[in-house]
């Protein structure tokens, strides 16, 4: 449970509260359905009890991850699979086909570790997952990401669009997940498909 108090509300003025997905103790909240209650306190409210007998309650779903492609897509289960043989090495990510220009969002919020262009990856960005030991890499974007190294990113925040830059055959997202200590910092890539399939079900 998380409680917020606002003392600056006024009639006819829109007021917002942003929840960062943590509990009152500062720990990440679990995935699931949450409800929020709007209530008022004070003597001026007592006179309104007859018309507002119960607080307004709404619900929403909270998930710590988001599927990175906002549009029609198809997993490449052939040469685009993690571990598929390549010239002298194996494929280190999962390719997901989507039309060029399809929006991409951060699967997990965090801090941008790298953002740039590389001959094989094309336009790419690497984000370290806040509250996780993992790094998330997105490659072949049509244009450079609008985000810069060191910027903070929210889960689900736009990071670019699908493209075919670099060594890419057709429009798709090449997505990698790396364990600690991170992407090309001594960590190792692992198969992201089970995670992508899970996120795809609720995103």
Predicted regions and their residues:
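Short loop/turn motifs at secondary-structure boundaries
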Residues: 1-60
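Short hydrophobic alpha-helix segments
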Residues: 4-7, 116, 162
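Short coil/turn motifs at secondary-structure junctions
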Residues: 24, 43, 115, 178-182
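Surface-exposed, glycine-biased beta-strand/turn segments
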Residues: 35, 39, 44-45, 52-123, ...
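Conserved, short, structured surface segments that act as functional micro-motifs
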Residues: 35-36, 92-95, 125-127, 134, ...
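Solvent-exposed coil/turn segments that connect beta secondary-structure elements
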Residues: 41, 101, 130-132, 180-181
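Zn2+-dependent peptidoglycan hydrolase active-site motif and core
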Residues: 106-145, 149, 171-179
């Amino acid at each position: 449970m998380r409680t917020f108090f606002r003392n600056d509300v006024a009639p006819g003025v829109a007021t917002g509260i942003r929840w960062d997905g943590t509990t009152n103790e500062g720990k990440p909240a679990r995935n699931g359905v949450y409800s929020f209650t709007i209530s008022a306190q004070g003597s001026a409210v007592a006179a309104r009890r007859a018309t507002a007998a119960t607080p307004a309650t709404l619900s929403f779903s909270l998930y710590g991850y988001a599927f990175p492609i906002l549009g029609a897509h198809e997993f490449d289960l052939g040469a685009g699979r993690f571990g598929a043989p390549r010239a002298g090495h194996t494929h280190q990510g999962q390719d997901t086909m989507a039309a060029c220009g399809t929006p991409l969002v951060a699967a997990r919020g965090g801090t941008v570790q790298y953002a740039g262009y590389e001959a094989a990856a094309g336009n790419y960005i690497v984000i370290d997952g806040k509250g996780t030991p993992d790094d998330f890499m997105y490659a072949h974007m049509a244009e450079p990401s609008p985000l810069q190294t060191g910027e903070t990113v929210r889960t689900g925040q736009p990071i670019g669009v699908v493209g075919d830059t670099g060594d890419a055959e057709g429009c798709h997202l090449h997505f990698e997940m790396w364990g600690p200590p991170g992407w090309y910092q001594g960590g190792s890539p692992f198969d992201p498909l089970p995670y992508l399939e899970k996120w795809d079900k609720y995103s």
